[in-house]
Amino acid sequence: MINREIRPDRKNKNIISMIQSCLVLILVVFIIFMMIQITRLQGTARVINYAGLVRGATQRLVKLEITGSRNDELIKYLDDILSGLRYQDGHYDLVKLHDKEYQDKLQIQSEYWEKLKIEIEAVRSGGYQNTDIVNMSETYFHMADETVFAAENYSEKIAVEIRTIELLSALDMLCLVILIIIQTLTAMK
């Protein structure tokens, strides 16, 4: 009779131990996923900042060009930032965001930047009155806005994924604590 009572108790202990092992394994997987997401998130704030810098600096450049003040250094600066945003090169420590929407917007913006530079050359040679520089500058500003918003959306998506993993990890740990309490209470009987 005693052996039969011990067996179900031992069986319950084994089941609880197996469940605990699974929960610990799941927790390890959650931590790995969270570390991956945090790595993806690192550097996005800098990308958002520099994407915004491109927007503002381009407007400044156009204003300077319209008033007859050439600024080839600013053009080079903008070229370098756009290259860093697209290819993760240069000396601004920019990361490449692996997000299709952002990359598509950045590609369109970069292509339009090349057209805008051609228009700047036209301003330099014939004055801004004979060009479409103001309208092109406005179009470029909106493109840059869309690129910044896409980078912000990417960052927000990752933050939501990290928050979800955090909540699932907390739930996993709560289950582990409950099982430990059950084991402790069972051992005290």
Locate predicted features.
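Short, Lys/Arg-rich, polar N-terminal cytosolic tail immediately upstream
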Residues: 1-10
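Extreme N-terminal signal-anchor transmembrane helix of membrane signaling/transducer proteins, especially
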Residues: 10-38, 171-180
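Juxtamembrane membrane-water interface segments immediately C-terminal to a transmembrane helix
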Residues: 37-76
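Amphipathic alpha-helical coiled-coil segments with heptad-repeat character
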Residues: 44-47, 71, 99, 106, ...
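Extracytoplasmic
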Residues: 48, 53, 57-64, 104-163
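Extracytoplasmic ligand-binding sensor domains of the Cache superfamily
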Residues: 64-122
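Selective recognition of signaling/oligomerization transmembrane alpha-helices
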Residues: 153-189
